[in-house]
């Protein structure tokens, strides 16, 4: 901005000059500053010719002679003295005496001047002084406006640079957030994203959401699901357990009134594990809590007459024939019209788990022709495992 030529005073003051001129309601110039009298006499002579057509030749000649002075008068004060102008024109046409026109013009011109305040005499030095002062003022205002706009541009550029620095690639930037549960197959302890569920008491056949907690042990032979029992027509969630190849008894009770009495959040303190009742939101491969092989965790399998179907990411259904159902742990069902949620014990044929013996004592039964939901695609169904073991 220092190298460019500053604008002139007329350029800076152009709009203000226009506004000031039209707001002042400008008056016409006095008689001394009129345009040349040739135009005024030409206009007035044209008017005289119009009037002469209706008069005698002598009157018309006199009218045209008097129209010269009246023409000067009309152009001089046509704004302030419009009424006088009309009357003088009429008088010029009829009487043809220019003296009456001159008299009216003189009176009209003196009237506004005497009534107004005496104007200040404008000399050349006064005008130059005013122009110098106004030029300094306008240049100062121009510099301030340019400075403000320059500061705004500079600030916006700095903000843009800061935004680029914050969002640009760097340590911790430009990469996805590292998610827990992405290394469950590497045997590390992970924290999958889970949603904490509240205890729901089912009154009148309420079905609380089924809780599925999976545990991946470090030995591939002992993979298990935590069996979650759900209360009957008046009950809620009963018990939660983990399976890592051990035996034990589950905790939890079911009141017939629909009250849901559960143990505290720490379900596995007896086996050295701390786990909360959560719903896994990730696929089964990324979900897992690694349990040490030295810890024997209890497997709880408590099933009631009804259950809420599990909504897994990959729903898979299996048809259980009657022959395999006969080989499964049998028992009497209180309500044969409803399917059962069974505790799935995943164990290899070489090392049967003691949890199967515990599950055999439970009143569980595979119904013939009933579709049983399976938690995921990555585990073998216990009925299929039993069939292969028998073969």
Curated annotation (Swiss-Prot):
GO molecular function: transcription cis-regulatory region binding; transcription corepressor binding
Organism: Drosophila insularis (Fruit fly)
Compositional bias ranges of the Gly residues kind: 93-114, 241-255
Subunit relationships: Forms a heterodimer with timeless (TIM); the complex then translocates into the nucleus.
GO CC aspect terms: nucleus; perinuclear region of cytoplasm
Name of this protein: Period circadian protein
Main location: nucleus
Source organism phylogeny: Eukaryota, Metazoa, Ecdysozoa, Arthropoda, Hexapoda
Example GO biological process: circadian regulation of gene expression
Gene name per UniProt: per
Subcellular location: Nucleus; Cytoplasm, Perinuclear region
Keywords noted in UniProt: Biological rhythms, Cytoplasm, Nucleus, Phosphoprotein, Repeat
Chain intervals for the UniProt region annotation (Disordered): 27-121, 163-188, 241-270, 328-357
């Amino acid at each position: 901005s220092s190298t460019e030529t500053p604008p002139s005073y007329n350029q800076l003051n152009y709009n203000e000059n226009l506004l000031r001129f039209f707001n002042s309601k400008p008056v016409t110039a006095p008689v001394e500053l009129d345009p040349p009298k040739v135009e005024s006499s030409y206009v007035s002579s044209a008017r005289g010719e119009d009037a002469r057509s209706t008069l005698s030749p002598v009157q018309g000649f006199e009218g045209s002679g008097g129209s010269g002075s009246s023409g000067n008068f009309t152009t001089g004060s046509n704004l302030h003295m419009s009424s006088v102008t009309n009357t003088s024109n009429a008088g010029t046409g009829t009487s043809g005496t220019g003296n009456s026109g001159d008299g009216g013009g003189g009176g009209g011109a003196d009237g506004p001047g005497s009534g107004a305040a005496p104007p200040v005499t404008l000399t050349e030095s006064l005008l130059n002084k005013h122009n110098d002062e106004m030029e300094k003022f306008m240049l100062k205002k121009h510099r301030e406006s340019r400075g403000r706009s320059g500061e705004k541009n500079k600030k916006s550029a700095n903000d843009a640079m800061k935004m680029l620095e914050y969002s640009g690639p760097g340590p911790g930037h430009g990469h996805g957030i590292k998610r827990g549960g992405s290394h469950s197959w590497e045997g590390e302890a992970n924290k999958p994203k889970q949603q904490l569920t509240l205890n729901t008491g089912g009154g009148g056949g309420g079905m609380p959401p089924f809780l599925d907690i999976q545990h991946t042990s470090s030995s591939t032979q002992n993979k298990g699901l935590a069996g979650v029992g759900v209360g009957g027509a008046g009950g809620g969630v009963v018990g939660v357990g983990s399976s890592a190849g051990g035996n034990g008894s589950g905790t939890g009770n079911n009141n017939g009134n629909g009250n849901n009495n559960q143990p505290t959040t720490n379900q596995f303190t007896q086996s050295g594990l701390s786990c909360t009742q959560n719903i896994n939101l990730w696929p089964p491969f990324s979900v897992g809590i690694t349990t040490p092989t030295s810890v024997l965790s209890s497997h709880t399998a408590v099933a009631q007459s009804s259950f809420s179907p599990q909504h897994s990411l990959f729903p898979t259904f299996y048809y259980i024939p009657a022959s395999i159902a006969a080989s499964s742990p049998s028992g009497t069902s209180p309500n044969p019209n409803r399917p059962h949620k069974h505790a799935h014990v995943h164990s290899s044929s070489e090392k049967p788990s003691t949890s199967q013996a515990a599950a055999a004592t439970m009143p569980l039964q595979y119904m013939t022709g009933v579709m049983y939901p399976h938690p995921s695609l990555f585990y073998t169904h216990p009925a299929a495992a039993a069939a292969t073991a028998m073969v």
